[in-house]
């Protein structure tokens, strides 16, 4: 179904995308749930107690698995088919300053409640990375790809549900949870706390950061991490200082992709004060909004501001004027040197800016979960080899050096392969890295450590058995002097 816009509406155009209620499986077939894989709970429905049907104590609910219709003992009374039945909370699409569109609650939402499913195209991680790069090159300003499992992602850029509009917050009131539904993993947005009507929904993206432009976070939380995805491994690897004295990638030098640039009204005034009431009113009157219910999306052509919208706008204005934001905005707007150039989502030619001012992403592999602030001193094997006396010794050290290099390359390429699983595990405590993936990683890490150990023990062994070369006369005299000195000391 095409999500259409009302051409009479004022303000920003509504986004164009295809609205879907279930994940799209064009990339691969939907798995067919085998009968032996269907998990059947032990709930018994009691007509006198409607809560007896698949509630908190249902074995399937406890294991984040939806009951399979036709197999649940509670039959049609089963309450554990929320994804399948699209039992969504009522929400409304609204324009949020600086952050594009967002979703607000239209009703009281209880802590832990299922809000809606994050639907999109199910694609492989390889495809996801490719698409992310293509979108960026084509100037697609918002990112809609999220992790599904170790090997797949959901891309809601072209096809998706309303969940694609939920913005990020470093202090979120929602979270994503993975559920098993009829043999497939599906991602749901759940309330982390009770949410009152008119409150914007937000979860912590903590998403994969693929390199390239970074988006400044405008969530306004006190403990805001500064950038979207700033906690992701990729982002940290790219922005941390890696070598002594090499601060090319330190956080204060990275180019910024600033979503606040999109809307003129979101720019803080020169003196750092918040927008005037007049500006706020203008913002409110030009807002567009959509309302969602469980099974339909209705457009609203009403352009009169409701108290809820005013709240939302006021909230974002406050956000913009917090002390942290003032500092961030001033930095980004005043400094236009190539190193700190603002990468605008609207005006900037992303690929041009990328090639001119973004530092090249280094292929530094994941280093065992630790960011590297202390530079590791590398032994220069070529120099060491020159010191060795025999050809055999040299060959041995060179052979171990080769093995060490291969092990490092293997670990590095493996990291690219399994990074989604590692990050998913770090992000989402309910998931665990598949044993096969963990085993591969441990094996490759051990191989690299062993290769390093073999190399350095070979260096030590061969250096130790290399006779000291005859030295020039000057050195000899100096050493002789030292010997005398030692003897003298001994004599005393
Ligand atoms: C999944 S979309 C969310 C919906 C989006 N606002 C829209 O209009 O379609 C993610 C994008 O929204 C923007 N965004 C979300 N949360 C943000 C935040 N806290 N600060 C700045 N931009 C944000 C970023 O451009 C991000 O790539």
Swiss-Prot record:
It is found in: Nucleus; Chromosome, Centromere. Disruption phenotype: Late flowering. Residues 259-340 are annotated as: Disordered. Residues 277-290, 317-326 have a biased composition (Basic and acidic residues). GO terms for molecular function: histone H3K4 trimethyltransferase activity. Pfam families: AWS, SET. Its EC number is 2.1.1.354. Keywords: Centromere, Chromatin regulator, Chromosome, Flowering, Methyltransferase, Nucleus, S-adenosyl-L-methionine, Transferase. GO terms for cellular component: chromosome, centromeric region; nucleus. GO terms for biological process: DNA repair; flower development; methylation; response to UV-B; vegetative to reproductive phase transition of meristem. It catalyses: L-lysyl(4)-[histone H3] + 3 S-adenosyl-L-methionine = N(6),N(6),N(6)-trimethyl-L-lysyl(4)-[histone H3] + 3 S-adenosyl-L-homocysteine + 3 H(+). Residues 36-87 form the AWS domain. Residues 266-275, 291-306, 328-339 have a biased composition (Polar residues). Histone methyltransferase involved in regulation of flowering time. Required for the expression of the SOC1/AGL20 gene. Required for histone H3 trimethylation on 'Lys-4' (H3K4me3) at the SOC1 locus. Prevents trimethylation on 'Lys-27' (H3K27me3) at the same locus. PANTHER family: SET DOMAIN PROTEINS. Belongs to the class V-like SAM-binding methyltransferase superfamily. Histone-lysine methyltransferase family. SET2 subfamily. This is Histone-lysine N-methyltransferase ASHH1. It comes from Arabidopsis thaliana (Mouse-ear cress). The lineage of its organism: Eukaryota, Viridiplantae, Streptophyta, Embryophyta, Tracheophyta. The gene is ASHH1.
């Amino acid at each position: 179904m095409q999500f259409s816009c009302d051409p009479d509406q004022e303000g920003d155009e509504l986004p164009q995308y295809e609205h879907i209620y279930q994940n799209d499986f064009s990339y691969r077939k939907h798995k067919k749930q085998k009968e032996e894989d269907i998990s059947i709970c032990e709930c018994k429905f009691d007509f006198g107690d409607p809560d007896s049907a698949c509630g908190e104590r249902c074995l399937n609910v406890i294991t984040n698995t939806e009951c399979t219709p036709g197999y649940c003992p509670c039959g049609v009374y089963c309450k554990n088919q929320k994804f399948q039945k699209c039992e969504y909370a009522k929400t409304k699409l609204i324009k949020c300053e600086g952050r594009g569109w967002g979703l607000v609650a239209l009703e009281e939402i209880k802590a832990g409640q299922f809000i809606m499913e994050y639907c999109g195209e199910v694609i492989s991680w390889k495809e996801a990375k490719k698409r992310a790069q293509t979108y960026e090159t084509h100037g697609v300003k918002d990112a809609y790809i999220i992790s599904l499992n170790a090997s797949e992602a959901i891309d809601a850029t072209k096809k998706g549900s309303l969940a694609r509009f939920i913005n990020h917050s470093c202090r979120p009131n929602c979270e994503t949870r993975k559920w098993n539904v009829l043999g497939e993993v599906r991602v749901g947005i759940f309330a982390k706390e009770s949410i009152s009507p008119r409150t914007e929904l937000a979860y912590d993206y903590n998403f994969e950061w693929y390199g390239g432009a970074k988006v400044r976070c405008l969530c306004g939380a006190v403990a805001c991490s500064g950038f979207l995805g700033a906690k992701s491994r990729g982002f940290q690897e790219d922005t941390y200082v890696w070598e002594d004295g090499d601060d090319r990638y330190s956080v204060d030098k990275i180019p910024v992709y600033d979503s606040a640039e999109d809307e003129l009204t979101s720019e803080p005034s020169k003196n750092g004060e918040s927008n005037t009431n007049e500006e706020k009113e203008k913002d409110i009157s030009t807002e567009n909004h959509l309302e969602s219910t469980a099974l339909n999306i209705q457009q609203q052509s009403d352009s009169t501001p409701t108290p809820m919208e005013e709240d939302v706008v006021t909230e974002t204005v406050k956000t913009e004027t917090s002390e942290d934001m003032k500092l961030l905005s001033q930095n980004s707007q005043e400094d236009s040197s190539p190193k700190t150039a603002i990468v605008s989502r609207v005006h900037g030619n992303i690929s041009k800016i990328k090639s001119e001012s973004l530092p090249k992403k280094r292929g530094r592999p994941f280093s065992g979960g630790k960011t590297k602030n202390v530079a590791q001193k590398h032994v220069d094997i070529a120099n060491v080899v020159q010191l060795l006396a025999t050809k055999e010794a040299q060959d041995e050290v060179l052979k171990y050096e080769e093995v060490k290099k291969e092990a490092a390359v293997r670990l590095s390429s493996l990291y690219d392969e399994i990074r989604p699983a590692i990050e998913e595990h770090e992000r989402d405590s309910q998931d665990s890295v598949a044993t096969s993936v963990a085993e591969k990683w441990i094996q490759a890490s051990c191989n690299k450590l062993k290769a390093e150990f073999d190399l350095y023990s070979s260096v030590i062994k061969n250096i130790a058995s290399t006779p000291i070369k005859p030295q020039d006369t000057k050195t000899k005299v100096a050493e002789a002097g030292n010997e005398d000195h030692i003897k003298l000391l001994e004599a005393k």
